[in-house]
Amino acid sequence: MNYQQQLANSAAIRAEIQRFESVHPNIYSIYELLERLDEPVLQNQIREHVIAIEDAFVNSQEWTLSRSVPELKVGIVGNLASGKSALVHRYLTGTYVQEESPEGGRFKKEIVVDGQSYLLLIRDEGGPPEAQFAMWVDAVIFVFSLEDEISFQTVYHYYSRLANYRNTSEIPMVLVGTQDAISGSNPRVIDDSRARKLSNDLKRCTYYETCATYGLNVERVFQDVAQKIVATRKKQQLSIGPCKSLPNSPSHTSVCSTQVSAVHISQTSNGGGSLSDYSSSVPSTPSTSQKELRIDVPPAASTPTPVRKQSKRRSNLFTSRKGSDPDKDKKGLESRADSIGSGRAIPIKQGMLLKRSGKSLNKEWKKKYVTLSDNGVLTYHPSLHDYMQNVHGKEIDLLRTTVKVPGKRPPRATSSCAPVASPKTNGLTKEVSGLQISPNTGNVTSSTSVTQMASGPSGISLGSFSRMDGMHQRSYSVSSADQWSEGAVITNSAISSDTGLGDSVCSSPSISSTTSPKLDPPPSPHANRKKHRRKKSTSNFKVDGLSSTAEEQEENFEFIIVSLTSQSWHFEATSYEERDAWVQAIESQILASLQSCESSKNKSRLTSQNEALALQSIRNLPGNSHCVDCDAQSPDWASLNLGALMCIECSGIHRNLGTHLSRVRSLDLDDWPPELIKVMSAIGNELANSVWEGSSQGHVKPCSESPREEKERWIRAKYEQRLFLSPLPCRDLPLGQQLLRATAEEDLRAVILLLAHGSREEVNETCGEGDRRTSLHLACRKGNVVLVQLLIWYGVDVMARDFHGNTALAYAKQAVTSEVRELLLQYGCPDEQFVLMATPNLSRKNNRNNNSNAGGSGLMPTLI
């Protein structure tokens, strides 16, 4: 690292410390100002908000997030007309917001890449990229609007600004063109070729066109940029060579052949313990050691200032502010029992238990307040007060754990899980969770069965059942075959951890911990293992699995939670009844967590299978085997509002038309919600062309081999100019009234034809002044999600109310159709409903008169 970079890092550290230290003095000033308020209620309300802000600041990710949780830092740049704020809002919430945020924003979201969860940090920059932004990001998304030339040119400017601060070859980039603002009055001005050229100029980055109004490619953009970051980190990690990973402790002083500065090591608490999370910060040539860099940073800047020392913390993490709420200080914990867990899920079981410390040199037992929630999480706090304040707590996710009781056999497997071996063989049977133990090699391999190992009457052995843990091995052996006369079966609770918290495999007293893979166990396996624990006997089991002597039963109220990652937690109750109640409750939560996990997998698998079958049924519709515009075989792109399939070349032309004419989506690459599948399944190419090519006589339709220009002329004439559109079925009746009738009769082809001919005003025509229902109300009353979706795409007003003030959502609730209700809520339809009752006779007469103009009584409302 050169001297200038070292100075820059030192300045950045000083600035961060100054920023961090400035927060609390300002908060304390707010507390002082609160004392001047005369209204106690307002004073307490503001104080609670300030305390919440202070707690959120103190518990930010840099102090609380596990170092095993990696981060992905994504920056998004573009001008105010680019649509970047709508893109981010759609990704985070699934909804569309048209307003652009001039100041940008900071957001967090979990994202999964290659099966691993990452904390995605999204930085929506309000202006051009600066030096601090450039050095922070792992990847950059450049956003412009396809209808705004200035936003397009701004990308070039922002890219050059970024290149001034950082080498762009080390930053993954994605270019996004947004379609949100494209409309009939605001056409597209950036064609596909110019956008592709821009992506090539930006070091050939990936280019996407998105639409935040209905989510086109939004998820793909962020998923792709996350995958690019992970791939870049892996490449950089491999290129570093022998420096595989950083030490787990930030205070570790050893360095690899390529040294890493202390600045970056101090940041590893946010990004996990792997060098791949921040390998871009490793300098190419070693220049300054960690100790030298630490010396350069003045010690005064890394310690609290005198102002901070004089000011004591006033939040609920520590003591309450004097005078802020004297009643709370006078109340004891017993008087506040009703407030336990306020604002959180009510535990299904809670109480005081003893917990053994996990520290290697200090394994005493301490009282903990333990709670078990119905979400499969067990939490323990040092005291009831800490639990009530929700501080200093630790959680155990029970999904990948098991619970053991020392001195008690694990549950015996039945024949359906593992057949019992003969008493003479003492063999280990098959089907043990896919783990295969080799008696010769000492390796643990993945298989579907465990080989039998017979050891005769003298005992059975697991051979060298070893696993690597840091730099040592641990092997287990089993003896005393007379205790296993009915066959040994390894269950989930049979594998002890190597932290000294589990007594044995299968809780047998004859399992020893050795440092060499001997088959013969030492004569006294427990001679040196439990010096730190109170004396407990673990021999001579009874049939029910409990000890047979009164001495063994004395004070034996312990249970152990063991995880798949070899972590263990020792707890002890005050009685057998309390211990068994805890064990039963924990086992039930483990079972519930496993069942919910399996249910989620089955649901996901079933959803995926159902979607694949639905898409295949779409391909099998009449005419869908060929492109709707050029007859190319096997089209795999779709236009949602047209309900037709097309080839990839025609889909590019459709994208240029704008979303107001054609909403393009990939059958294979995009998600398909149920309402979209129903629209595509209801229409198809044959029905679509019967409408859009109903008057194409005398015109030659292009074929799959036709040049792109010819296809584009045909498509624009067909959809943009509507030259081949079938004529209206009735010239005497207004188009809006025809649409109302067709919707009431659920005539899909007529609705498509009328929507293609109609304007926004005609689509929103009502049944009459005494009714004021639109076609959307009628479609919702029928529960027809296909018609509802088509009407919304063609501009029907989802906020429209009938004569009695009811929105379309009220009619959807009457029809008991959840799909229609969810669709309306997605597009912002108000969830308001007036009392629905039978229509008075006078209103019925008026409605008959109004509906007679529509051509029939099918439009007469029966509810208000």
Swiss-Prot record:
SUPFAM superfamilies: Ankyrin repeat, ArfGap/RecO-like zinc finger, P-loop containing nucleoside triphosphate hydrolases, PH domain-like. PROSITE patterns: ANK_REP_REGION, ANK_REPEAT, ARFGAP, GLD, PH_DOMAIN. Its main location: cytoplasm. Keywords: ANK repeat, Cytoplasm, GTP-binding, GTPase activation, Metal-binding, Nucleotide-binding, Protein transport, Repeat, Transport, Zinc, Zinc-finger. It is found in: Cytoplasm. Residues 527-537 have a biased composition (Basic residues). The keyword Transit peptide does not apply. Gene3D superfamilies: Ankyrin repeat-containing domain, Arf GTPase activating protein, P-loop containing nucleotide triphosphate hydrolases, Pleckstrin-homology domain (PH domain)/Phosphotyrosine-binding domain (PTB). ANK repeats lie at residues 771-800, 804-833. One of its GO terms (molecular function) is zinc ion binding. Homodimer. Interacts with several subunits of the AP-3 protein complex. This is Arf-GAP with GTPase, ANK repeat and PH domain-containing protein 1. It comes from Xenopus laevis. The gene is agap1.
